[in-house]
Amino acid sequence: MKNPRVHEIATAMIDAVRKVLVDHQ
């Protein structure tokens, strides 16, 4: 089950979460 789109969205979500966590530190 290799869907590049899903991987792309997951990476973007992780990136956004990391940004928020870093901003709140």
Curated annotation (Swiss-Prot):
Pathway where it operates: Xenobiotic degradation; 2-(2,4-dichlorophenoxy)propanoate degradation
Annotated GO biological process: catabolic process
Keywords annotated in UniProt: Aromatic hydrocarbons catabolism, Dioxygenase, Iron, Metal-binding, Oxidoreductase
Enzymatic reactions: 3,5-dichlorocatechol + O2 = (2E,4E)-2,4-dichloromuconate + 2 H(+)
EC number annotated for this UniProt entry: 1.13.11.-
Molecular function GO labels: dioxygenase activity; metal ion binding
Upregulation: By chemostress caused by the herbicide 2,4-dichlorophenoxypropionic acid (2,4-DCPP) and its metabolites.
Note accompanying the cofactor annotation: Binds 1 Fe(3+) ion per subunit.
Domain of life, per lineage: Bacteria
Requisite cofactors: Fe(3+)
Family membership: Belongs to the intradiol ring-cleavage dioxygenase family.
The protein, known as: Chlorocatechol 1,2-dioxygenase 2
Organism of origin: Delftia acidovorans
